[in-house]
């Protein structure tokens, strides 16, 4: 099987690890080996201290490569923060985004390669040569695209980078809208459209539907390519609340209810063929979409592999019907 997964950060990375485990088990049972291509969100990317940081790409790379801080779900294991402490001592800003010493090395390599003229897709491939994540990891685009948030507070109406809204303010400042700066003129990275075209099916992990998967689908050409395939998604909402993070604040901003049904309808039956929901949402009905219920908390590797395996099973079933 050739599988394409659209992924954000923590939720996407953990789902991918479960997917790898599920496919490995199938191979042990005699099934043909499968390949996974991950199209990663780069809308969260930000330049800090002259370094280009790609949080979601790095989270996927570190998680699948065995270098992630498991407790946090982001950043490097065994991290230190000497450089950050020195920057704070110099009064450098921003101080709300903590770059660890090991993590900074990744950003230095990326930034030097960007300055030398290499595209982000080639840089990501080079970084993965070290981590060997066991998937083909592609950025959604080689062009610079950033998600900004229009907010209104005591400082007035202004646009701030998504990372500032998310990390510094914990999404507590009411947002008026999200703006994907640069997306309109961006092109899918090399290999993205061909990977989708050649895939047996596409999976949406329980990543943020607005600023992660939504950002990927917002690159011209990607949504249409995905819509032509069998697509199965895993709900990031359980019992009316996000599985993790603050996706409810993002959904509220675009006028979408925080529910498994509403997120599926936001994606649309023209895009989504199957939808996995938690048992708490077993009564979910989405017109034109096959809905299945199972425990969706990715509480341990076995449960995560079971969720990913169920998504694969549903995708194969729906593909067979089409």
UniProtKB/Swiss-Prot annotation:
Q: What does this protein do?
A: Catalyzes the transfer of the phosphoenolpyruvate moiety from enoylpyruvoyl-2-diphospho-5'-guanosine (EPPG) to 7,8-didemethyl-8-hydroxy-5-deazariboflavin (FO) with the formation of dehydro coenzyme F420-0 and GMP.
Reactions this protein catalyses: enolpyruvoyl-2-diphospho-5'-guanosine + 7,8-didemethyl-8-hydroxy-5-deazariboflavin = dehydro coenzyme F420-0 + GMP + H(+)
Question: Which pathway does the protein contribute to?
Answer: Cofactor biosynthesis; coenzyme F420 biosynthesis
Q: How does it assemble?
A: Homodimer.
Q: Does the keyword Protease apply?
A: no
Q: What's the domain of life for this entry?
A: Bacteria
* Needed co-factor(s): Mg(2+)
Q: Name one GO molecular function term.
A: magnesium ion binding
Asked if Transferase is a keyword of the record, the answer is yes
Q: What is this enzyme's EC? A: 2.7.8.28
Residues noted as binding 7,8-didemethyl-8-hydroxy-5-deazariboflavin in the record, renumbered to the chain: 58
Looking up Pfam families in the UniProt record yields: CofD (PF01933)
The protein's UniProt keywords, in alphabetical order, are:
Magnesium, Transferase
State the organism of origin. Thermobifida fusca (strain YX)
Family, per entry = Belongs to the CofD family.
Protein name, as recorded: Phosphoenolpyruvate transferase
């Amino acid at each position: 099987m050739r599988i394409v997964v659209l992924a954000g950060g923590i939720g996407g990375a953990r789902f991918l690890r479960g997917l790898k485990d599920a496919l490995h088990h199938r191979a042990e049972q005699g099934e043909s080996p499968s390949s996974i291509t991950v199209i990663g969100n780069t809308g969260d990317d930000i330049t800090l201290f002259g370094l280009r940081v790609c949080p979601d790409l790095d989270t996927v790379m570190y998680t699948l490569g065995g270098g992630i801080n498991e407790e946090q779900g982001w950043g490097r294991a065994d991290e230190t923060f000497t450089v950050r402490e020195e920057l704070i001592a110099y009064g450098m800003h921003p101080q709300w985004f903590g770059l660890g010493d090991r993590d900074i090395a990744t950003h230095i390599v990326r930034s030097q390669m960007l300055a030398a003229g290499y595209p982000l897709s080639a840089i990501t491939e080079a970084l993965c040569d070290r981590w060997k994540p066991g998937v083909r990891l592609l950025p959604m685009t080689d062009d610079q695209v950033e998600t900004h948030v229009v907010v209104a507070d005591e400082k007035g109406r202004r646009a701030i980078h998504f990372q500032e809204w998310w990390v510094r303010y914990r999404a507590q400042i009411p947002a008026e809208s999200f703006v994907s700066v640069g997306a309109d003129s961006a092109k899918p990275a090399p290999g993205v459209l061909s990977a989708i075209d050649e895939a047996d099916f596409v999976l949406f992990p329980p990543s943020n539907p607005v600023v992660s998967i939504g950002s990927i689908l917002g690159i011209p050409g990607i949504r249409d390519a995905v819509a032509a395939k069998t697509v199965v998604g895993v709900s990031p909402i359980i019992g009316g609340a996000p599985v993790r993070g603050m996706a409810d604040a993002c959904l509220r901003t675009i006028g979408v209810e925080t529910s498994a049904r509403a997120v599926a309808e936001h994606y649309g039956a023209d895009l989504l063929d199957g939808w996995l929901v938690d048992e708490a949402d077993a009564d979910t009905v989405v017109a034109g979409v096959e809905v299945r219920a199972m425990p969706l908390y990715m509480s341990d590797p076995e449960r995560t592999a079971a969720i990913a395996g169920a998504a694969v099973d549903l995708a194969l079933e729906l593909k067979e019907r089409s």
